[in-house]
């Protein structure tokens, strides 16, 4: 009886497997070779597609006004696309052009296929008449992009120095600060290609945020990554007091690296003024806090390409984890300092990771580098500190001629990677039980490019003290390199 039961079970399993395989075969598969195509008005591109068990194809939908612009070639398994020349948002479209001839600038093309089993499957391709900005001639570890509804590309086959070769086989989003910030990411002819849209509420502005794009080798190992800083901000103009400020002869961005604002008029503006945090000498950033007070250690949310959540982890420094190579391959790991590492994330201390000249690990965009301590020397608080500054989370600092707001963003702790933004001026041994009454609301810590000595490097440091309604500024205070701090970029000299 047992043998008969086993035989029946085996037959049923085989039948179920056959049905499953049959269903998979009946469904068929269909996919474009790339997720998107970007064209100029009147431009043409051919995009291939692949299929399994499909007997016929058709274009089932396309953007308005692209009716005659798309030609399906079943034999070549490709679609030829010609971009329209007159668009519904174009001023020329109102000059005698029939309404039905006006085209959308962007939209989705849907290719439908019918399988041999009679099932219908589809594949989609984003088509857009939009500007393509090629940044391949500006190699760096971070790219500032500020144009809405643009396609951006950069070299994927070299590190941020533009010299060291990479065996990049694929690219993917390591993390992004909002879902769908980076769209239609692909590796095309050795270049990273992606699209950034417009802000949902203000469609004349870029969709702002931060992301990290990773390069992977043929085995799927992460071998490099690049920070994309999408912001309505352009530091290229030379106007002091505008998008840049000049301190001690250094032209400096007037906001932190990765920040989406630079001010403290509202709590939203304070939060947007937080940039990203960096461990000294590492090129990859760590996201900012979830709230402007940043006193509970919570990070803002991060997402992958499929809108799933991504988490930051911490790992203690040792001979294996405390290396530059490990840091590159694990950008989502905060390498904490220990007594054995002298509270440096790098097990063997390396003062050359950042420096006076832009290094392969420098996190700033092309033409910019981490500010040295000399750039902050002599800065003082503009105006007279007052009790109302308790909620301002930063100072406007000046050298007597120029000035810039610096947010008090605290730091990521060297021992666990959480965000800490409480300044406690009283030595620990002298504190009473009620230490919260002594804790000050915020402090500012910014890494400099100076190597310092041993396991410590100089940081630019300022704070607010509520007991005296005052504050102070120091430009080169030694801190353990495992701390994560904000960064200001200066033009390379």
What are these language model-derived features?
Residues 1-8:
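Bacterial N-terminal signal peptides that target proteins for export
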Residues 10-38, 120-132:
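Bacterial Sec-dependent N-terminal signal peptides
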Residues 28-32, 52-92, 131-201:
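Surface-exposed binding patches on compact interaction domains or structured appendages
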Residues 89-116, 207-218:
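A short beta-strand micro-motif common to beta-rich folds, especially ectodomain repeats
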Residues 114-123, 219-225:
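Short, exposed coil/turn segments at beta-strand boundaries within extracellular/luminal domains
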Residues 134-165, 215, 220-274:
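GGW-centered surface loops in extracellular recognition modules
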Residues 189-191, 209-211, 238-383, 474, ...:
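Short aromatic-cysteine micro-motif
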Residues 259, 336-493:
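C-terminal, surface-exposed recognition/capping segments
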């Amino acid at each position: 009886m047992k043998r008969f039961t086993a035989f029946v079970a085996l037959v049923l399993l085989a039948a179920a497997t056959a049905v499953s395989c049959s269903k998979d075969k009946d469904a068929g598969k269909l996919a474009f070779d790339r997720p998107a195509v970007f064209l100029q008005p009147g431009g043409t591109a051919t995009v291939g597609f692949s299929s399994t068990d499909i007997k016929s194809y058709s274009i089932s939908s396309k953007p308005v006004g692209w009716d005659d612009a798309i030609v399906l070639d079943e034999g070549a398994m490709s679609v030829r696309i010609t971009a329209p020349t007159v668009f519904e948002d174009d001023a020329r479209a109102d000059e005698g052009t029939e309404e039905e001839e006006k085209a959308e600038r962007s939209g989705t093309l849907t290719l439908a296929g019918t399988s041999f089993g009679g099932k219908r499957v589809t594949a989609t391709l984003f088509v857009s008449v939009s500007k393509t900005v090629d940044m391949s001639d500006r190699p760096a570890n971070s790219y500032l992009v500020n144009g809405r509804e643009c396609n951006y590309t950069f070299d994927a086959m070299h590190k941020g120095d533009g010299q060291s070769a990479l065996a990049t086989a694929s690219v993917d989003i390591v993390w992004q600060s909002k879902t769908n910030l980076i769209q239609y990411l692909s590796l095309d002819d050795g270049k990273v290609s992606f699209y950034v849209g417009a802000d949902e509420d203000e469609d004349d502005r870029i969709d702002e945020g931060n992301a990290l794009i990773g390069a992977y080798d043929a085995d799927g190992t992460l071998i490099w990554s690049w920070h994309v800083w999408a912001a309505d901000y352009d530091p290229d103009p030379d106007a002091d007091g505008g998008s840049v400020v000049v301190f001690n002869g250094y032209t400096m961005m007037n906001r932190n690296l990765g920040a989406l604002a630079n001010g403290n008029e509202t709590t939203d503006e304070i939060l947007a003024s937080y940039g990203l945090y960096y461990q000294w000498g590492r090129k990859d950033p760590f996201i900012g806090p979830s709230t402007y007070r940043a006193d509970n250690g919570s990070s803002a949310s991060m997402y992958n390409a499929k809108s799933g959540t991504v988490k930051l982890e911490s790992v203690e420094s040792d001979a294996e984890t405390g290396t530059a190579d490990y840091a590159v391959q694990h950008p989502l790991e905060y390498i904490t300092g220990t007594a054995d590492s002298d509270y440096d994330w790098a097990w063997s201390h390396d003062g050359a990771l950042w420096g006076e000249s832009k290094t392969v690990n420098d996190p700033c965009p092309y033409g910019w580098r981490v500010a040295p301590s000399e750039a902050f020397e002599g800065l003082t608080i503009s105006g007279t500190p007052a009790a109302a500054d308790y909620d301002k989370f930063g100072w406007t600092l000046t050298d007597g001629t120029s000035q810039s707001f610096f947010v008090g963003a605290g730091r990521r702790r060297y021992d666990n990677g959480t965000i800490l933004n409480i300044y406690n001026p009283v030595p620990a041994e002298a504190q009473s039980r009620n230490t919260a009454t002594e804790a000050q609301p915020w402090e500012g810590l910014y890494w400099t490019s100076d190597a310092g000595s041993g396991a410590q490097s100089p940081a630019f440091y300022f704070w607010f003290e509520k007991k005296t309604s005052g504050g102070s500024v120091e430009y080169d205070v030694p801190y353990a390199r495992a701390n994560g701090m904000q960064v200001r970029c200066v033009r390379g000299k």
